[in-house]
Amino acid sequence: MSADFWSSSQRNRWQLTRHSLLESRRKLLLLEKKMIQNGFIKDYPNVEYDANTRIYLHNLLIKLGRRLNVRQIALATAEIYMSRFLIKVSLKEINVYLLVTTCLYAACKIEECPQHIRLITSEARNLWPEYIPQDVTKLAEFEFYLIEEMDSFLVLHHPYRSLLQIRDYLNENFALYGFSLSDDELQNSWSLINDSYITDLHLLLPPHIIAIATIYITIVLKKNISSLRLGANSMSNDTVGMDPHTKPNSNSIHAEDLMALATGGSAINDIGNPSSGTNGFHDIELDENTIKINKFMTFLDHSHVNLNEVVEAIQDIITLYAIWNRYNEMSVKKVLQDMLLNRSV
């Protein structure tokens, strides 16, 4: 266990590169093919661990977490457990609904908000009665399987803490940087972090990089967003935030805002360059938001963070929303249903 990310197992054992992650998934695909050839598992060609499946699993976890009133930090930990596990184990070997339940059960223990095994099994059965067994020992067995595949490294560091530290630092150094994060901006950044767990970012980058990327989307791209909306009404973004009961307001960033940004990354490419960061916004006057952008760029310049990693995180988050816009829950649900119900026949 480590209170410091830089000496933690998360960084030293579980922070991957894109190449190593791709190689791990390639090896898993080869193993899956061998298991199918040897008759250990059946082949379901439509079952893939792609972005659509990850969005579906994310939504399952949120549904179960809300029934149990689980803290957001435990949900985030459960998502990373799930991502790590599915690097090593094929979807075609397991019950994904039991995986979601087990990840949340283990995460609640680690994040010191434990749920009784009978309660979490009962709530999961209420949601997915055809997939969750009544026997609680099945969940306990899966927990050992999960921990083994993660090499027993369970303690995690999340961007939420980094986000709050940045907020506090900006407040304390307002005289130097001349701006701070508003409550709305903090909430927007927090919600973006929630959604970022669908991606591979938490296997690839340090938490503070992801936190800065979400602030960048909220602060810097907000000016582009306002020009891209063209007066259109925005849908509410149904994600778990700092306060799940807070209704979105007109300043909130929504999925279609990020969708528009996914088709044109000029603002992303300007990161770290305060002068060019404002010229692309249709020659707007230096209003309050533009001044804030320049001040945030100054903070970024002083922070000495890896800007290439920040750009990488921003692009992944925006791409996620582009995929989410085309997401079809029923198609993913049907594919998993066919696999799990046919397996039990």
From Swiss-Prot:
TM annotation in the entry: none
One Pfam family linked to the record: Cyclin_N
Main location: nucleus
GO biological processes: cellular response to heat; meiotic cell cycle; negative regulation of transcription by RNA polymerase II; positive regulation of transcription by galactose; positive regulation of transcription by RNA polymerase II
Keywords noted in UniProt: Activator, Cyclin, Nucleus, Repressor, Transcription, Transcription regulation
CDD domains the UniProt entry points to: CYCLIN_CCNC_rpt1 (cd20513)
Subcellular location: Nucleus
Any one GO CC term of the record: mediator complex
Cystine pairings recorded for this chain: none
GO molecular function ontology, one term from the record: cyclin-dependent protein serine/threonine kinase regulator activity
Ranges where the Cyclin N-terminal domain occurs: 23-147
InterPro entries xref list: Cyclin-like_dom, Cyclin-like_sf, Cyclin/Ssn8, Cyclin_N
Subunit structure as annotated in this protein's UniProt entry: Component of the SRB8-11 complex, a regulatory module of the Mediator complex.
Free-text function comment from the UniProt entry: Component of the SRB8-11 complex. The SRB8-11 complex is a regulatory module of the Mediator complex which is itself involved in regulation of basal and activated RNA polymerase II-dependent transcription. The SRB8-11 complex may be involved in the transcriptional repression of a subset of genes regulated by Mediator. It may inhibit the association of the Mediator complex with RNA polymerase II to form the holoenzyme complex. The SRB8-11 complex phosphorylates the C-terminal domain (CTD) of the largest subunit of RNA polymerase II.
Family per record: Belongs to the cyclin family. Cyclin C subfamily.
Name listed for the protein in its UniProt record: RNA polymerase II holoenzyme cyclin-like subunit
